[in-house]
């Protein structure tokens, strides 16, 4: 994580303030819903309005137009199962940005890639919903990890030949490293001085392994914090009934059964 003065102010897209942004521009043929050209650029933007997920974003005509465009694109460039709300729209655009950057970095033979290998021996039940099917594949996969170009593999869960994280440089170190690399390779910002020293230090094999270890620890803490946050904000949550899926039944040494439980509404186990 970056210091608060950077993450909440200087580097954050604050409403009404001018900010620099690394941008993927798409040129789309409306008749064929085809991406005919794309390019990466450094831009200066001014955020007119910061929207939140719990507001009626689709009431805004510009947001609605973007939503409909993404929904159509997903028919031909399918990165998510469906586009039903602005959550899905943002997820789609983030995956697309990450993938297009990964393709460029792959050609340049550099970058910090994100790989995820599926356990091909595991076959999920046929009767479960698509979301549960995907979760079970993820649960029984060999896990995702960051790796350099020499060791990178495909992202099987997204069904993409290459993938990087680059859309969240404020909250994830790998995204920041990839932005430094890609902007240097594109001639947008030169790599020198402290910038070069910082990148070289974090791209060492032992540093990448440290990133992988700390990311796993952070995810465990995040899950616990999310659960505590839910319970602290809603006193009635303990009285509600939620849909859940039980899996991975095992018999313990004391002859009792132990299960794993996944709750789709909270995306928690």
Where are these regions (language model features)?
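Electropositive polyanion-binding surfaces
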Residues: 1-269
